[in-house]
């Protein structure tokens, strides 16, 4: 999973066509996190505007980062203070990549940093980012992803 601020994402000069995004200037730094299996998720729920004939999307990204440390704490604080864009990877035989929050960004909805009681309990962060978008998530090619700098 990768995150950057919405303003940094916009500086990539994103171009949208046929449900995909390409980057004109892939120089923005994304924070990249390798997540444990079966502990993170994303969804992009289409939501009709009742009788108004409108449709919008409510994206949500929830992820868990194991182990508390100062570097992660500082990054979580930076991301929490900004509107962000997330790029997520699916768990398929051939993974696909999706950018979420590309128009309005995602805001921190809930965040928890702490340790559990039992030896097997989480010692780390659980973060949920949510947004409100006019369009669904967009595909990111592996070629464009390769051009992104990861922090």
Residue spans for each PLM region:
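Short acidic, glycine/tyrosine-flanked loop/strand segments centered on an H-E-D-like triad
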Residues: 60-64, 91-112
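Mixed-charge, glycine-accented linear interaction segment located at domain edges/termini
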Residues: 105-151
């Amino acid at each position: 999973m990768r995150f950057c601020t919405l303003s940094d994402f916009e500086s990539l000069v994103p171009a949208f066509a046929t449900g995909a995004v390409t980057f004109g200037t892939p120089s923005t730094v994304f924070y990249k996190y390798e997540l444990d299996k079966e502990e993170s998720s994303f969804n992009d729920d289409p939501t009709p505007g009742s009788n108004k004939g409108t449709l919008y999307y409510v994206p949500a990204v929830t992820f868990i980062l194991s182990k508390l440390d100062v570097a992660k704490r500082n990054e979580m604080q930076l991301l929490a203070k900004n509107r962000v864009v997330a790029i997520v990877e699916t768990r398929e035989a051939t993974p696909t990549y999706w950018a979420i929050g590309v128009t309005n960004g995602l805001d921190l909805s809930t965040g928890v940093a702490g340790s559990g009681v039992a030896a097997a309990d989480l010692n780390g962060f659980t973060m949920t980012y949510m947004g409100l978008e006019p369009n669904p998530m967009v595909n990111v090619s592996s070629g464009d992803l390769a051009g992104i700098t990861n922090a």
